[in-house]
Amino acid sequence: MKNIRNFSIIAHIDHGKSTLSDRIIQICGGLSDREMEAQVLDSMDLERERGITIKAQSVTLDYKAADGETYHLNFIDTPGHVDFSYEVSRSLAACEGALLVVDAGQGVEAQTLANCYTAMEMDLEVVPVLNKIDLPAADPERVAEEIEDIVGIDATDAVRCSAKTGVGVQDVLERLVRDIPPPEGDPEGPLQALIIDSWFDNYLGVVSLVRIKNGTMRKGDKVKVMSTGQVYNADRLGIFTPKQIDRTKLKCGEVGWLVCAIKDIHGAPVGDTLTLARNPAEKALPGFKKVKPQVYAGLFPVSSDDYENFRDALGKLSLNDASLFYEPESSTALGFGFRCGFLGLLHMEIIQERLEREYDLDLITTAPTVVYEVETTAKEIIYVDSPSKLPPLNNIYELREPIAECHMLLPQAYLGNVITLCVEKRGVQTNMVYHGNQVALTYEIPMAEVVLDFFDRLKSTSRGYASLDYNFKRFQASDMVRVDVLINNERVDALALITHRGNSQSRGRELVEKMKELIPRQQFDIAIQAAIGTHIIARSTVKQLRKNVLAKCYGGDISRKKKLLQKQKEGKKRMKQIGNVELPQEAFLAILHVGKDSK
């Protein structure tokens, strides 16, 4: 056991985690040069296309160190995006140490900080690594000072390497073996294995990634899931050397995969503890905090025949992604679907794309909303995650919206722009600290504003230099209203949105204008209105298509023309009574972009 090292690689987006993993795998000979490819751990097509890591991946490698000993390295490559931070905390729970990778050109960014604090809270040994020293813009001295100043860990002798060229990666491994402590645990004690992650394989059923904390797990053992008490047979187990390799047992301190022929998706939840049926452990290991979704949106299959497949797909995906929340929902405009909860907009986009790709579904998404706390006049408190569930205005005593605490790190040059943006988003500044030429800003901003497009706009006002980390702080009373959209005097539930009273006029007007562009013209006039309660705040009309009935009139008898026009008018009126308006998918997505173009 003293030769096992478990560690994660944590860093801000694009600081080179996945490339460093590639080099480590290459040096330790996990894959032959022929099998090696760039970002070998980003196995999902989506990850490669966007160049981001979404799922944490684990690998077990053997490394022969300079002291002649052979060490087992179990390492986990983690995502860097704020939306996937729960993946990072799950990976860290399985480790004793973490490599904090910092780009020697960019310096410390907000996610670097957030992930590093997560690691420190879990009492992990953090080893700083300065990456990308081959860049002409690299300034390792300055960045080492930044790490000490902002993060507060000693970085004077931080390892310098370039994952791209492979310089210094050997030193990283030596430092790892020296500084990160071996796992603790009792190899003879009763088995306790933490489920770090699981996913669904069509042939094997549920595959779980486990970290053995105490005891040993052997092939063929009867394993008990502690939360449900169900017993399964450990059919196969092994390790990843990126490839799945079968083993006969997993020893204390190791990280490996396990297949128990579990067909039920909820059979082995992530964060649960496995133990032996015949010699069970006294208590379960502390799991992970359940992450609360911040953004909710309705997902509906385009054709209602896909509903069953859609339900199964969501089940399989939620196994792989513990933070996805979903419950059935029906809408008059869109039929049956699910209300899903996500950690942020990127998460929502990724999930939608994974559903469409991996399970071949066509989906319609409604506008994302956050959760509001409503105190009714009967003094009940309810939580509302969709505009259609909001009680009538006269039953609401107080409506409270979620406030997020946002930590931003940015160069001083962009401070003015960013402050203007935060104020426009109804933010309140709570803190501001200067570190060298970087500024750390803390703002409290309503979650609804952060979730919509704050991140994109922050990046664009600061030319990509500002970075953001946010978390839910509290609910706060504020003047929010529901804007309904009426098409030909019928409310369309899927188009309603909740917004601040100050913006409601402009939001309503903009939404109506957007709709006017997107709804195709029909044989009759379509009235589009935005309303708060019964008060109409904006209206526009999609003009009808009409045939020129006077074209065949030759000469000028006015009564003949009037008769024809009158007849046409009556026809249109009848049509309007029975006509339905088809809404294209773009119309639902228009709400997402309301408030973006006007800036």
Swiss-Prot record:
Enzyme Commission numbers on file: 3.6.5.n1
Gene Ontology molecular function: any one: GTPase activity
Pfam families on file: EFG_C, GTP_EFTU, GTP_EFTU_D2, LepA_C
Any one GO biological process: positive regulation of translation
Membrane topology: Peripheral membrane protein
Database matches in PROSITE patterns: G_TR_1, G_TR_2
Signal sequence interval, chain numbering: none
GO cellular component entries: plasma membrane
InterPro entries (UniProt xref): EF-4 (IPR006297), EFG_III/V (IPR035647), EFG_V-like (IPR000640), EFTu-like_2 (IPR004161), G_TR_CS (IPR031157), LepA_C_sf (IPR038363), LepA_CTD (IPR013842), LepA_IV (IPR035654)
Domain (tr-type G): residue spans on this chain: 2-184
Catalytic activity: GTP + H2O = GDP + phosphate + H(+)
Protein family (similarity comment): Belongs to the TRAFAC class translation factor GTPase superfamily. Classic translation factor GTPase family. LepA subfamily.
Protein name: Elongation factor 4
Lineage: Bacteria, Pseudomonadati, Pseudomonadota, Gammaproteobacteria, Enterobacterales
Gene: lepA
